[in-house]
Amino acid sequence: MALKVRVITPDRTVLDDSVEEVILPSSSGQIGILSGHAPLLTALESGVIRVRTSGWENIAITDGFAEVEANEVKVLVNTAAKGQDIDLEEARKAFESAKAQLDQVNAADRKAILDARKELKRTRARYMAAGGMA
């Protein structure tokens, strides 16, 4: 039995397909979802969603939520991009820049630290989805 997965951002649907398995980056760790999974509502963190059909596909996301019910997974996130649509070299440069920016943040500026960490997670997800950091 197939699992219907939809990844939706405020401005578009990134994925709407039947898959065999999906792995979500939840706030409590990665969650693997197969057909017949119990109903679930979970918060998602910036990371990579992995979906398996005949092979694996990566989707970089930022924070959001996922609902699993009746063999359907609805993922609502702020942004999402398929790994195949992300330029690997551009993603690598953005990730390196975010790492450097975090290293330069004033340790006393908590907001700046949080913002830099959030940007690092976002750029890391895009880099990983594009095939970097294997």
Curated annotation (Swiss-Prot):
Q: Where in the cell is it found?
A: Cellular thylakoid membrane
Pfam families per the UniProt record, alphabetical: ATP-synt_DE_N
What Gene Ontology molecular function terms does this protein carry? Answer: ATP binding; proton-transporting ATP synthase activity, rotational mechanism
Q: Which domain of life is it from?
A: Bacteria
Q: Which keywords describe this protein according to UniProt?
A: ATP synthesis, CF(1), Hydrogen ion transport, Ion transport, Membrane, Thylakoid, Transport
Membrane topology per the entry is: Peripheral membrane protein
- Entry GO CC: plasma membrane-derived thylakoid membrane; proton-transporting ATP synthase complex
UniProt xrefs under PANTHER family: ATP SYNTHASE DELTA/EPSILON CHAIN, ATP SYNTHASE EPSILON CHAIN, CHLOROPLASTIC
* Assembly notes: F-type ATPases have 2 components, CF(1) - the catalytic core - and CF(0) - the membrane proton channel. CF(1) has five subunits: alpha(3), beta(3), gamma(1), delta(1), epsilon(1). CF(0) has three main subunits: a, b and c.
Per its database record, what is this protein's job? Produces ATP from ADP in the presence of a proton gradient across the membrane.
Q: Which family does it belong to?
A: Belongs to the ATPase epsilon chain family.
NCBIfam families cross-referenced by the UniProt entry: ATP_synt_epsi
UniProt protein name: ATP synthase epsilon chain
Q: Which organism is it from?
A: Picosynechococcus sp. (strain ATCC 27264 / PCC 7002 / PR-6)
Q: What lineage does the source organism belong to?
A: Bacteria, Bacillati, Cyanobacteriota, Cyanophyceae, Oscillatoriophycideae
